From Swiss-Prot:
UniProt KW Hydrolase keyword: yes
Gene Ontology MF, one: magnesium ion binding
Domain of life per record: Bacteria
Entry's cofactor comment: Binds 1 Mg(2+) ion per subunit. Binds 1 zinc ion per subunit.
EC number assigned by the record: 3.5.4.19
Catalysed reactions listed for this entry: 1-(5-phospho-beta-D-ribosyl)-5'-AMP + H2O = 1-(5-phospho-beta-D-ribosyl)-5-[(5-phospho-beta-D-ribosylamino)methylideneamino]imidazole-4-carboxamide
Keywords associated with the record: Amino-acid biosynthesis, Cytoplasm, Histidine biosynthesis, Hydrolase, Magnesium, Metal-binding, Zinc
Name assigned to this protein: Phosphoribosyl-AMP cyclohydrolase
Gene Ontology CC annotations of this record: cytoplasm
Annotated residues for binding of Zn(2+): 78, 94, 101
Source species taxonomy: Bacteria, Pseudomonadati, Pseudomonadota, Alphaproteobacteria, Acetobacterales
Organism of origin: Granulibacter bethesdensis (strain ATCC BAA-1260 / CGDNIH1)
Entry's localization field: Cytoplasm
Length: 128
């Protein structure tokens, strides 16, 4: 059995793409980034931690909003440059108050349709 860090290929900034997916439904929830420290914390605690590029630091999912992701399984793709984070996400995953960050669909003609409305007011999640 290999060590996970032997197969993950981090980019020049020490980050790897992480796709969060609801473990029991297959719903794609969000895309984020992880560094080694975020992966180590996630594996150690079972609570998903990402790396925030805008804040340049660890982002413990749900720390502010209460919308915690619990790790079910961590998978590495064939090239080692992307992670699939299978999670249990009871509430919303998106900062817009939606279940998934992928709530817009683009038609072949380029028009964009909003598929879902917010389930929670973002101000309720994060304050004003």
């Amino acid at each position: 059995m290999s060590d996970v860090f032997d197969i993950i290929r981090f980019n020049d900034q020490g980050l790897v793409t992480a796709i969060a997916q609801q473990h029991d439904t297959g719903e794609v929830l969000m895309l984020a980034w992880m560094n080694r420290e975020a992966i180590e914390e996630t594996l150690a605690t079972g609570r998903v931690c990402y790396f925030s590029r805008s804040r340049n630091g660890l982002w413990r999912k749900g720390e502010t909003s209460g919308q915690v992701q619990t790790l079910i399984e961590l998978r590495v793709d064939c090239d080692g440059d992307a992670l699939l984070v299978l999670v249990d996400q009871p509430g919303v995953a998106c900062h817009t108050g939606r279940r998934s960050c992928f709530y817009r669909a683009m038609g072949k003609d380029g028009t964009v349709t909003t598929l879902t409305e917010p389930l929670i007011d973002p101000h309720t999640l994060y304050g004003s």
